[in-house]
């Protein structure tokens, strides 16, 4: 079940302890409304197609061709790819670490979860919005939004990624260690 937890971005007593969340909700409409208030898109779509365990990027994109075409058309996205992570993926640790530090993008970060789950943490103003996305969730993080992503130590997900450029995923890391203080997908 998708979940949103909203925290202040700083501890209460200066001891580095995680502050208590201001909000925790599992209701998709509430998640959508809270994120929309901060200009983040969130939708739930049916992920109606089951993928074979050995599905490659071409198979995944073909299976979800109508959804891909709609998102590309509506958002003007030039490029789309599919990322699929499994608990035995040989690069899982390196890829997890790559996304765990706070960063921004010059373009929107748009992801549709076809399988599994991932944890997006968005650092907006004085809040951190920890958003658990699961199968059927589409999240659109606006360009310039400070955030990080956790796939967990034993990742199991497939997501379609949409880009406004031909280079794909390009990040600018902030150097802020804030991500170390917030919940991960463990």
Curated annotation (Swiss-Prot):
Binds 1 Fe(2+) cation per monomer. Binds 1 nickel ion per monomer. Keywords: Amino-acid biosynthesis, Dioxygenase, Iron, Metal-binding, Methionine biosynthesis, Nickel, Oxidoreductase. GO terms for molecular function: acireductone dioxygenase (Ni2+-requiring) activity; acireductone dioxygenase [iron(II)-requiring] activity; iron ion binding; nickel cation binding. Its cofactor is Fe(2+); Ni(2+). Fe(2+) binds at residues 103, 105, 109, 147. GO terms for biological process: L-methionine salvage from methylthioadenosine; L-methionine salvage from S-adenosylmethionine. The record marks 102 as: May play a role in metal incorporation in vivo. Ni(2+) binds at residues 103, 105, 109, 147. It is an enzyme of class 1 (oxidoreductase). Gene3D superfamilies: Jelly Rolls (2.60.120.10). Pathway: Amino-acid biosynthesis; L-methionine biosynthesis via salvage pathway; L-methionine from S-methyl-5-thio-alpha-D-ribose 1-phosphate: step 5/6. It catalyses: 1,2-dihydroxy-5-(methylsulfanyl)pent-1-en-3-one + O2 = 3-(methylsulfanyl)propanoate + CO + formate + 2 H(+); 1,2-dihydroxy-5-(methylsulfanyl)pent-1-en-3-one + O2 = 4-methylsulfanyl-2-oxobutanoate + formate + 2 H(+). Its EC number is 1.13.11.54, 1.13.11.53. Pfam families: ARD (PF03079). The record marks 108 as: May play a role in transmitting local conformational changes. Monomer. Belongs to the acireductone dioxygenase (ARD) family. Catalyzes 2 different reactions between oxygen and the acireductone 1,2-dihydroxy-3-keto-5-methylthiopentene (DHK-MTPene) depending upon the metal bound in the active site. Fe-containing acireductone dioxygenase (Fe-ARD) produces formate and 2-keto-4-methylthiobutyrate (KMTB), the alpha-ketoacid precursor of methionine in the methionine recycle pathway. Ni-containing acireductone dioxygenase (Ni-ARD) produces methylthiopropionate, carbon monoxide and formate, and does not lie on the methionine recycle pathway. This is Acireductone dioxygenase. It comes from Parasynechococcus marenigrum (strain WH8102).
């Amino acid at each position: 079940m998708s979940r949103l937890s909203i925290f202040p971005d700083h501890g209460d007593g200066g001891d580095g302890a995680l502050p208590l969340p201001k909000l925790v909700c599992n209701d998709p409409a509430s998640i959508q409304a809270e994120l929309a208030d901060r200009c983040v898109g969130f939708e739930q779509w049916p992920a109606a197609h089951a993928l074979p365990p050995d599905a490659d990027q071409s198979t995944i994109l073909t299976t979800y061709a109508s959804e891909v075409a709609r998102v590309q058309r509506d958002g003007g996205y030039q490029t789309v790819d599919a990322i699929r992570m499994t608990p035995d993926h040989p690069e899982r640790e390196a890829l997890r670490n790559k996304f765990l530090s706070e960063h921004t993008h010059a373009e929107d970060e748009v992801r549709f979860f076809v399988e599994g789950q991932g944890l997006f943490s968005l650092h907006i103003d004085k809040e951190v919005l920890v958003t658990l996305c699961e199968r059927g969730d589409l999240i659109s993080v606006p360009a310039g939004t400070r955030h990080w992503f956790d796939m967990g130590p034993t990742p199991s997900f497939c997501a379609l990624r949409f880009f406004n450029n031909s280079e794909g995923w390009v990040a600018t890391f902030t150097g802020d260690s804030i991500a170390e203080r917030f919940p991960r997908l463990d």
